[in-house]
Amino acid sequence: MTTMGTPLTPNATKVMMLGSGELGKEVVIELQRLGVEVIAVDRYANAPAQQVAHRAYTISMLDDDALRAVVEQEKPDFIVPEVEAIATETLVELEQKGYQVVPTAKATQLTMNREGIRRLAAEELGLPTSPYRFVDNFADFQQAVLAVGVPCVVKPIMSSSGHGQSIIKSLDQIQQAWDYSQAGGRAGGGRVIVEGFIKFDYEITLLTVRHINGTSFLAPIGHRQQNGDYRESWQPQAMSEVALQKAQQIAERITTALGGRGIFGVELFVCGDDIIFNEVSPRPHDTGMVTMASQELSQFALHARAILGLPIPHIEQFGPAASKAIVVEGKSNNVMFVGLDKVLEERGTHIRLFGKAEVNGHRRLGVILARDESTDKALAKVERAYANLTVKL
């Protein structure tokens, strides 16, 4: 029988979020609904999840000593990484000391960089993937591009939201792609993956939740990206039953190998009835924000239940839904949103503003959500709502 304490008392059940972005913010809200005391950590102050947590710390999570110190000070029942840029060796050490890392320190370590997870998927599990090479210098990079062939995709082994990613369509773009990859990695310049370009019909995120009752799959999520970063998503993505079964088999194999409990964002390419593994993140996925409109239990609520060992007997879908990211470009520390009344005037439309105070370049500041009779109608609805929004920088 699961027992929960009360926040801010000696018997509190404590969760520490490592990374406090918009996805972490929704997880914090769901945890607090279940009576959990939450501590939010990030590299900058007043990050979205820190705004709704009981306490917050601002440290470099790549600093072993700083990370260890904040964990040992708070002594959380669960440590929940929300980003890749974390000193994972310290998480392994803390797990060995008895701290519970979600889903596991191994999963966090393997998925923090593309090399670990690609070698697990392709070389250990034998899952279908694109052809690839890993390199850490320009000379080897040139050879890798020639070996894989053009077009090909270049990604730093540690990056997110499309940072440092590019497509090489001709050999005269090799230097430009290398320079961009070295500027975009989470831990600075370094190792990259060169991937063969897959001619896929579409790509999906198959959110997979490992919990005390077993493994459950959410309806597949389709999405559109721009420069490697999510812009729109919809659920469900129509696909054949054969392809869906293959996708679920791949998702179950990779998440079982990673272990632990929680939600996993499994990224897959769909080519007819064939499925090709792309990546997996052991945490909520940005494309999964659509589940805040499409499901009774969003990916964040499911993650919270799985972390705490609470049952997930059924995942009910309300119907077709879509999401559209609110992305701006510029520089400001005084962001304002104009026209929210117009955004929300249509039935079944919702908005989430993340509370990010500063913009310096491209930044995702919120998301618009909608339900309708079909995903096409839901997408049209979020587009109409988006057109009514003005962001002043």
Swiss-Prot record:
It comes from the Bacteria. Signal peptide: none annotated. One of its GO terms (molecular function) is ATP binding. It catalyses: N(1)-(5-phospho-beta-D-ribosyl)glycinamide + formate + ATP = N(2)-formyl-N(1)-(5-phospho-beta-D-ribosyl)glycinamide + ADP + phosphate + H(+). ATP binds at residues 114, 155, 160-165, 195-198, 203. Residues 119-308 form the ATP-grasp domain. The keyword Nucleotide-binding applies. N(1)-(5-phospho-beta-D-ribosyl)glycinamide binds at residues 22-23, 82, 286, 356, 363-364. Pathway: Purine metabolism; IMP biosynthesis via de novo pathway; N(2)-formyl-N(1)-(5-phospho-D-ribosyl)glycinamide from N(1)-(5-phospho-D-ribosyl)glycinamide (formate route): step 1/1. Coiled coil: none annotated. Keywords: ATP-binding, Ligase, Magnesium, Metal-binding, Nucleotide-binding, Purine biosynthesis. The keyword Ligase applies. One of its GO terms (biological process) is 'de novo' IMP biosynthetic process. PROSITE patterns: ATP_GRASP (PS50975). SUPFAM superfamilies: Glutathione synthetase ATP-binding domain-like, PreATP-grasp domain, Rudiment single hybrid motif. Pfam families: ATP-grasp (PF02222), PurT_C (PF21244), RS_preATP-grasp-like (PF22660). Mg(2+) binds at residues 267, 279. Its EC number is 6.3.1.21. One of its GO terms (cellular component) is cytosol. Involved in the de novo purine biosynthesis. Catalyzes the transfer of formate to 5-phospho-ribosyl-glycinamide (GAR), producing 5-phospho-ribosyl-N-formylglycinamide (FGAR). Formate is provided by PurU via hydrolysis of 10-formyl-tetrahydrofolate. Homodimer. NCBIfam families: PRK09288.1, purT. PANTHER family: FORMATE-DEPENDENT PHOSPHORIBOSYLGLYCINAMIDE FORMYLTRANSFERASE. Belongs to the PurK/PurT family. This is Formate-dependent phosphoribosylglycinamide formyltransferase. It comes from Haemophilus ducreyi (strain 35000HP / ATCC 700724). The lineage of its organism: Bacteria, Pseudomonadati, Pseudomonadota, Gammaproteobacteria, Pasteurellales. The gene is purT.
